[in-house]
Amino acid sequence: MSDTCGNCDCADKTQCVKKGSSYTADIIETEKSIMTVVMDAPAAENDGKCKCGPSCSCTNCTCGH
């Protein structure tokens, strides 16, 4: 499935966001404290089933529609 991005076909593959969880966990260690930062990075206007970059027009993407 090298020509698909999640559940959608993208004309420009470089605009596709890697399929997987939209949550990123970064663990930052310092001398005095340990901090865990969890960021929610939702893809635009979908329910997480399809992730495409903002410049990617996925014509047959079913992003929860």
UniProtKB/Swiss-Prot annotation:
Per the UniProt entry, what is one GO biological process?
Answer: cellular detoxification
Q: Name one GO molecular function term.
A: copper ion binding
User: What are the protein's UniProt keywords?
Assistant: Metal-binding, Metal-thiolate cluster
Q: Which domain of life is it from?
A: Eukaryota
- Xref: InterPro entries: MT3 (IPR044671)
Q: In this entry, which stretches build a coiled coil?
A: none
The free-text function statement in the UniProt record for this protein reads: Metallothioneins have a high content of cysteine residues that bind various heavy metals.
Similarity annotation:
Belongs to the metallothionein superfamily. Type 15 family.
Tell me what this protein is called. Metallothionein-like protein type 3
User: What is this organism's lineage?
Assistant: Eukaryota, Viridiplantae, Streptophyta, Embryophyta, Tracheophyta
